[in-house]
Amino acid sequence: MRSAPLFVLGMWRSGTSLLYALLNQHPQIGLMYEGELAVLRSLFWIPGGKSDWAQRWNFWNSALDRHQIALDQAPKDVRRLPDAIRSIYRQHAAGKGATVWGCKSPNYYDFLPWLAEMFPAAQFIVIWRDPADVCRSILRAAEKDTWFRKRGVPHRALFGLRRMKLDCDRLQQQGIAIHEIEYEELVQNPSAVMKAICAFIDVPFDPRMTSLEGADRSAIYDGEHHSGVKGGKIARKENRPEVLPPAFKAKIERYTRLWRRDSHGSWPPGPRMEEGNTPGWFETTTDQLGFRAMRAFDALTAFIYCFVPIRLLENYRRAKTRNFEQQQKQDVRLL
């Protein structure tokens, strides 16, 4: 078993689930799917940690249930977050006889520096996709999935991509092991992309990594937005109607021009664009303030899940589910 983890990062709807499924086709790789224990880092702020950390983690995103790990298999005397991550993630990898352990999670998009500090020898794979396509996919997923309907998810995605790129470049300059790929290349030429990844993490290439046939996708959430990765073909859906609101589409284009100018055309990926406006000082300032406020709210939500009595959280979740079901019934009556 390797001493340091492998983390797979990318924005939501950018191909991280596909990449996870292909990576785990390798017999030596055993990544968890959106374990995200680091999101609940507040569990370990108290000296000695919280004894119910595993129960709260499982309540947060059913990570243990999805990976068929019994709650009593999680050690209760863990005092530090890195030790908790090692204990469970390595246990999961050992279950399939793998030596490469870690996690793929889009919710780590602004956690890169923190993960690198916690695991200095960790390796990172970052997948990029055209920001406009990321946001389109988020809006399509929101048609059926309530998580993507949260206010500001496309805004988080657009500016989270930029945050992740800045962190990625800075950490690479510091010598952190980061391998970058693009979604379109993965779909069009999975063999070349997966061979390069194998060279990066120093494992022999396995041809099974180029196909979804026989892939274990049991830990992936249900939902129509995961129908592609749960199918048998690596392909993107073409010729779909536009779903981006005109104003937000124009904003994405302005920022894409700005970021390509700043990177001399190397990032972000996507089709060639015509010359046009870039965002001004007021727009960039207000957008960044909005992004930071949203991420502060996300951090507060995670903090609440770490300390509020679980019974109260269960009652809140049941009430939220009932409200959603009632809203669905009302929507059906209006059709």
Question: For each of these PLM feature ranges, what is it?
Answer:
Residues 92-209, 219-232:
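PAPS-dependent sulfotransferase catalytic domain
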Residues 1-5, 199, 203-335:
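PAPS-dependent sulfotransferases, especially Golgi type II membrane carbohydrate sulfotransferases
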Residues 25, 30-109:
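PAPS-dependent sulfation machinery
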Residues 3-4, 14, 84, 107-110, ...:
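Short, conserved clusters of charged catalytic residues that mark active-site
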Residues 22-28, 118, 200:
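Active-site catalytic microenvironments for nucleophilic, acid-base chemistry
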Residues 1-25:
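Walker A (P-loop) phosphate-binding motif
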Residues 38-44, 135-136, 216-220:
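A short beta-to-alpha transition loop/helix N-cap that caps and shapes the active-site region
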